[in-house]
Curated annotation (Swiss-Prot):
Post-translational modifications reported in the UniProt record: Gla residues are produced after subsequent post-translational modifications of glutamate by a vitamin K-dependent gamma-carboxylase.
A molecular function GO annotation: calcium ion binding
Compartments reported by the entry: Membrane
Membrane topology: Single-pass type I membrane protein
Domain annotation Gla: ranges: 20-66
SMART domains with a match to the protein in the record: GLA
Name of the protein: Transmembrane gamma-carboxyglutamic acid protein 1
Extracellular membrane side: 21-80
Domain of life: Eukaryota
Region span, Disordered: 161-195
Segments passing through the bilayer: 81-101
Cytoplasmic face residues: 102-218
Recorded name of the encoding gene: PRRG1
């Protein structure tokens, strides 16, 4: 019998029960066999020990096994998804990395070819299409074309000839008719100046006689 059964110390050294994370919650709310079997896997013997009745145990066991089969079927579907999704995602990441490496390698290769050929590629946003100048047009040292200079010179000559052909505007004296008066004032006087007696006599003759006013004081 000693070979079949172990003592308490040896049994505790082999079989140990560790407290669960929700041990404090189990102390507050005492569980039953149904909740424990739903949360964990239990056997028929554990259910019979809990119910202590074969009929109740069989009834519980039939419903419990059916529920376990349904959950296992749903879990198998999700298991396929969990297995294939990481594989597809990892394959997509690998292809993306390979594509980026290939693009970088191709860009460096084209850049090296352009440098060896002596052509420096310009950025695309700086490319400006400019029409080439006509072959017969030659620019002088000032940067202006002869056609433009001829146009400027011809225009200035036409303006100067137009201004030379025009008569100057009349003066103020000519416009107001005071030219003869000004000329007569500037010409030298031929007659001698009048005498003093003539000036006095002419002033006295032109004077108006004044009538004396007599005022009487009362």
């Amino acid at each position: 019998m000693g070979r079949v059964f172990l003592t308490g110390e040896k049994a505790n050294s082999v079989l140990k029960r560790y407290p669960r994370a929700n041990g404090f919650f189990e102390e507050i709310r005492q569980g039953n066999i149904e909740r424990e079997c739903k949360e964990e896997f239990c056997t028929f013997e554990e259910a019979r020990e809990a119910f202590e009745n074969n009929e109740k145990t069989k009834e519980f066991w039939s419903t419990y096994t059916k529920a376990q089969q349904g959950e296992s079927n749903r879990g198998s579907d999700w298991f396929q998804f969990y297995l294939t999704f990481p594989l597809i995602f990892g394959l997509f990441i690998i292809l993306l990395v390979i594509f980026l490496i290939w693009r970088c390698f191709l860009r460096n290769k084209t850049r090296r070819q352009t440098v060896t050929e002596g052509h420096i590629p310009f950025p695309q946003h700086l490319n400006i299409i400019t029409p080439p100048p006509p072959p017969d047009e030659v620019f002088d040292s000032s940067g202006l074309s002869p056609g433009f200079l001829g146009y400027v010179v011809g225009r200035s000559d036409s303006v100067s000839t137009r201004l030379s052909n025009c008569d100057p505007p009349p003066t103020y004296e000519e416009a107001t008719g005071q030219v003869n008066l000004q000329r007569s004032e500037t010409e030298p006087h031929l007659d001698p100046p009048p005498e003093y007696e003539d000036i006095v006599n002419s002033n006295s003759a032109s004077a108006i006689p004044m009538v004396p006013v007599v005022t009487t004081i009362k």
